[in-house]
Each structure stands twice: as C-alpha cells, then as structure tokens.
C-alpha cells in the first residue's frame, strides 16, 4: 500500500443506534464528505430498505446524508453502474446481516473491486457485524466459530463482532482454532477497531476491544502495522 488508503473501521454491531455517536462522528470527520454510501447487502433477506432508512435518519443527525446502494444479489454486484457509484464514494458503510451472503455476493465482483479501489484512493470504509467480519481473511464462520475464507481487505486478523454478547463457546473456538500468528479481535457493539491511513490501529467506544494471539490476550500493539 502507498499510504493513500483511507480509514478502515470494524464496528462490533448495533450500527446507527444510540451509543454509536463517537464512532460515526470520527468516521464522518475522516471522510470529509457530505454523503455516506450504505450497502445493505448483508441484510438482503432482512428488509434492507429498513437498514437504509435507519442509516439515513442516523447520519442526518450527524450532519451527513446517507444513501442506500441496493447491491443485494450477485447480479447487482456485477453491475458496472453500481460499481461506478461505489468507486466514486468517499465513505462506504457495509451493514450487518448475513456474512455468508455478503461474502458470496461481493467476492470477486465488480462492486468489490470498486470498493477496494475507492479505499486505496482514500475513501473511508466501515463494516458493522457481518460487514466487519468479511473484510478480513480469514474470517470467522458464524455457524460455528471456525475460520473460513474472507474477502481480505486486510489479512492476518479475524473479527468477532458483538463481543461480550456472542456465544462464548463459539468465541472460544475462534480464538483457539486460529493459527498461532493470527490475531482474533473481539469488538463490542457500538465500538470500533479503526485502522488509520498510516497503518496504526485505535479503538473507539465505551467498551474495550480485545485482541488474542496464540489463544492469549494481547494489546492492540500486537496487530501488524497495516494489517496486511
């Protein structure tokens, strides 16, 4: 990476609800843009229009417009106009929902390529819950906690969202099954792990972000600079 990439945020869930102000204000400021593009892909089977409406109301309260880009199917993800819209955005936000559907829709698609290009050109990219999970490779498989192939915007780490509320047995499995050099990061709801353009990491929110390497708790400084 050449240092021009944008801020990258892994949000632990409960996006666009009271308590997320600190996270989203920081992202709006980093984007320095009047509009956030919301991809409700992971919520395709859970009334994605409601996710967009929630985002619109939430970001309006922060002085920013939100618009939904209905990339819900594999066909949508290959649409060149939708890809162009993603490429032109300065702030992209992947909603929560089904990480497996999100991965299958975006993997190797025109929209995913455009998102990567936008981020490398300085756009802010945020993902919450499912949206956070798929951005890494490997990623946590929500069906049992094992690790599987993710989209790999960053590597060397995997994200467990809803940390502190997720099934403890599944979380334990994710931590213990991880390779010895892989960081498993637990992010609580309404909190975020944020990668800055210089490759450094910070946590935002009222609850601590937890990092595990080799099955043991470590600090944020254990995350590889840049995460790649």
What would you call each of these model-derived segments?
Residues 34, 66-67, 125, 209:
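Hydrophobic anchor at the start of a short beta-strand
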Residues 95, 101-169:
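Class I SAM-dependent methyltransferase SAM-binding "motif I" and its flanking Rossmann-like core
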Residues 10, 67-68, 93-94, 125-128, ...:
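General beta-strand structural signal in soluble alpha/beta enzymes
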Residues 1-33, 42-53, 57-62, 139-141, ...:
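C-terminal and late-domain segments of enzyme folds
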Residues 13-17, 68-74, 101-105, 161-163:
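Short, flexible loop segments at the rims of nucleotide/cofactor-binding pockets, characterized by
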Residues 5, 33-36, 89, 122:
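A general structural motif
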Residues 37, 43-101:
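Portal/gating segments that form or line small-molecule/metal binding sites
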């Amino acid at each position: 990476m050449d240092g021009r990439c944008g801020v990258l945020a892994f949000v632990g869930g409960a996006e666009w609800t009271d308590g997320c102000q600190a996270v989203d204000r920081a992202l709006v400021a980093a984007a320095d843009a009047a509009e956030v593009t919301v991809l409700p892909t992971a919520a395709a089977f859970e009334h994605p229009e409601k996710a967009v409406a929630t985002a619109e109301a939430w970001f309006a309260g922060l002085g920013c417009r939100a618009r939904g880009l209905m990339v819900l199917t594999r066909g949508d993800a290959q649409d060149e106009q939708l890809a162009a819209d993603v490429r032109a955005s300065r702030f992209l936000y992947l909603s929560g929902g089904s990480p497996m559907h999100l991965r299958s829709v975006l993997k190797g698609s025109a929209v995913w390529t455009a998102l990567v290009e936008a981020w490398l050109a300085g756009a802010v990219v945020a993902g919450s819950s499912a949206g956070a999970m798929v951005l890494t490779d490997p990623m946590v498989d929500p069906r049992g906690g094992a690790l599987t192939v993710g989209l790999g915007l960053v590597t060397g780490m995997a994200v467990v969202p809803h940390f502190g509320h997720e099934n403890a047995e599944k979380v334990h499995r994710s931590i213990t099954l991880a390779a010895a050099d892989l960081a498993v990061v637990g992010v609580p709801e309404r909190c975020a792990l944020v990668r800055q353009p210089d490759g450094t990491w910070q946590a935002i929110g009222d609850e601590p972000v937890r990092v595990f390497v080799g099955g043991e708790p470590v600090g944020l400084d254990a995350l590889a600079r840049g995460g790649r």
